[in-house]
């Protein structure tokens, strides 16, 4: 074990950055240019050692850590909520806030951990929704830590056990955060804290229930994809294409070849969108083709630039990127990273994403005319499938501030706006003009988490059309069975009415297939459906059940049939050694976008699993990031008088 006061040697640090011993010296293994931070000038000579920008010691650098430890990128969300009715307790809680701020900065630099923390003070009367869930009297300090793998855990840490010095507070907090991190964070403690012992304890379920009689545990679940992300292209299908006849040039795209040029463009243009790509990778090649077509078509203002970095010609400039980064588009505003998308869609998808990025997370509607227009789904002169509008008496209203936080967390995915009406109570509504039920009103608490749940769930169509493809993780790698209406003249009422019920959509995913293309015929054949047959297919992983459309008489009857099917023998069991029947629909979309190619559809047993075991990255909550800083784009938290965010 290395002494705690000894940092990594130059040789050890090079091994940790590069993973091999062929290079000795300090190597820039992060990519500062990706977030608008100016790196040093271009090196001279062949492959010289790089230099970190001032104040930056590298993502995996920590002078007190054992050499060779390179933490995995991770995201954690936390809330420090406290009630300090006297001076002694106020002093302690103030120290905790300062220590949290210091920890956040240090872990981001040294442990590649993105920590998003919110401080909530409940000592005086407040509207903050979280205070209502805890005792209205007494003294308490709670830390709620949440990550996607373990969910939320509430910890208690008392002043009397941790007030010795800031080091004891730090060790208590690091103990809690370590339980939600891939590896222990104790190694990243400050010199003041490393010899201290803090005390923090997770509350039991019984203790949680006894905190407040009004407290209720309701798990928040959100849709992963927005309405513009329902038909994304599958990278695995792009990998097996030849890429022949792809257009690989565009007069509308600016090529960037150096850090100096990159920095100049960030200063010259207010908005910059950049694709980093590599011609040696088939997925990246197809993404560049799409991006060049977007640049030729989209209408943008003079202060906005679409550009690309050909990494196959600029290896040093793109150092630190991985395979997924080579089909990622990054957005900048006023020189700062504001977001990114690694999703691959058609030209319309990228157009919508750019427009959403330019318009911001939330728009203010200045008058009744604009409000009426937005309600009809008209945003930026185009008809959108869904929009969400909040009406508030003031932009200082707590409900509005929480709505704003929710919108910023979902930035780049949804069309969200607000209207100020001094005589109105807070109200939020989602409008979907193509649905039978055109509006959905919000009736929950005005807290960011449940507002996000409402926006994501109310914006998705009740029945998702998959005839022309679908996003892989929309149907695969999740627990809900898939219901597919195939054939039938017009709308099948029991199916459509059941899909309109929120509780039913929590249990099933409702989809529909129309048409008779060759790929649709292959899908129907693989599911055991005749060419002219009208049927509902109940697909539960590899189990196929077929329900004739004529059988259900009403929504309730259909629901009973579905409940009985769960325990009955399947009509057909799909083989994991054969291509998944729905994969053919995704091939159809790829051919539509890039032109027809005879595509070999391969079996993939992971499509039958709840999650992809070969996913490169662990799931990260929206807005999270790690590793290369340009991956950390997203909505910024908003401060209010009731709570501050570090």
Swiss-Prot record:
Listed name of the protein: Uncharacterized protein R05D3.9
Assigned keywords, A-Z: Signal
Cysteine disulfide links: none
Superkingdom field: Eukaryota
Bias (Pro residues) ranges: 40-51
UniProt organism field: Caenorhabditis elegans
Entry keyword annotation includes Signal: yes
Annotated signal sequence range: 1-29
Region (Disordered): 40-60, 620-646
């Amino acid at each position: 074990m290395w002494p705690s006061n000894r940092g990594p040697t130059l040789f050890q640090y090079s091994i940790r950055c590069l993973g091999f011993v062929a290079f000795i010296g300090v190597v820039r293994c992060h990519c500062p240019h990706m977030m608008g931070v100016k790196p040093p000038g271009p090196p001279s000579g062949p492959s010289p050692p790089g230099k970190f920008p001032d104040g930056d010691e590298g993502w995996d650098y920590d002078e007190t850590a054992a050499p060779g430890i390179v933490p995995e990128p991770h995201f954690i969300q936390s809330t420090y909520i406290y009630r300090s009715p006297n001076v002694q307790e106020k002093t302690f809680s103030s120290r905790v806030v300062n220590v949290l701020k210091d920890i956040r900065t240090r872990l981001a630099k040294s442990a590649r951990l993105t920590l998003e923390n919110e401080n909530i003070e409940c000592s005086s009367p407040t509207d903050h929704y979280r205070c209502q869930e805890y005792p209205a009297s007494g003294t308490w300090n709670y830390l709620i830590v949440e990550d996607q793998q373990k969910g939320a855990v509430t910890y208690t840490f008392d002043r009397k056990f941790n007030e010795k010095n800031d080091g004891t507070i730090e060790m208590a907090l690091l103990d809690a955060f370590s339980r939600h991190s891939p590896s222990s964070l104790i190694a990243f403690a400050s010199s003041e804290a490393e010899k201290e012992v803090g005390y923090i304890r997770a509350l039991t379920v019984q203790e949680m229930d006894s905190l407040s009689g009004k407290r209720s545990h309701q798990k928040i679940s959100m849709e992963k994809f927005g309405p513009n992300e329902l038909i994304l292209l599958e990278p695995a299908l792009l990998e097996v294409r030849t890429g022949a006849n792809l257009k690989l040039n565009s007069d509308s795209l600016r090529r960037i070849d150096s850090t100096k040029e990159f920095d100049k463009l960030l200063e010259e243009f207010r908005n910059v969108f950049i694709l980093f790509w590599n011609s040696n990778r088939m997925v990246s090649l197809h993404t560049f083709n799409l991006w060049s077509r977007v640049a030729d078509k989209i209408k943008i203002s003079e202060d906005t630039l679409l550009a690309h970095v050909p990494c196959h010609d600029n290896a040093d400039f793109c150092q630190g990127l991985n395979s997924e980064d080579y089909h990622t588009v990054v957005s900048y505003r006023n020189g700062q990273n504001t977001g990114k998308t690694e999703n691959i869609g058609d030209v319309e998808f990228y157009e919508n994403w750019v427009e959403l990025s330019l318009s911001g997370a939330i728009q203010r509607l200045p008058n009744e005319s604009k409000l009426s227009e937005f309600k009809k789904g008209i945003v930026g002169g185009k008809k959108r499938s869904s929009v969400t509008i909040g009406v508030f008496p003031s932009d200082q209203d707590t409900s509005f501030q929480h709505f704003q936080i929710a919108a910023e967390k979902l930035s780049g995915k949804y069309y969200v706006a607000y209207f100020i009406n001094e005589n109105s109570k807070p109200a939020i509504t989602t409008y979907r003009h193509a649905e039978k039920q055109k509006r959905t009103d919000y009736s929950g608490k005005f807290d960011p988490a449940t507002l996000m749940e409402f926006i994501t769930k109310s914006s998705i169509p009740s029945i998702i059309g998959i005839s022309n493809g679908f996003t892989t993780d929309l149907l695969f790698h999740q627990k809900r069975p898939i219901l597919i209406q195939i054939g039938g003249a017009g709308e099948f009422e029991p199916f459509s009415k059941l899909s309109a019920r929120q509780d039913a959509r929590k249990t099933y995913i409702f989809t529909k297939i129309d048409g008779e293309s060759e790929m649709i015929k292959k899908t129907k054949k693989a599911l055991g459906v005749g060419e002219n047959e009208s049927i509902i297919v109940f697909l539960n992983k590899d189990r196929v059940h077929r329900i004739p459309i004529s059988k259900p008489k009403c929504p309730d009857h259909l629901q009973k049939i579905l409940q009985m099917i769960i325990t009955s023998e399947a009509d057909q069991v799909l083989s994991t050694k054969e291509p998944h029947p729905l994969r053919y629909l995704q091939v159809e979309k790829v051919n539509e976008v890039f032109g027809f190619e005879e595509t070999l559809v391969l079996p993939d047993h992971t499509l039958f699993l709840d999650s992809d075991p070969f996913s490169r990255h662990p799931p990260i909550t929206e807005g999270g990031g790690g590793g290369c800083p340009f991956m950390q784009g997203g909505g910024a938290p908003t401060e209010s008088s009731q709570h501050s965010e570090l």
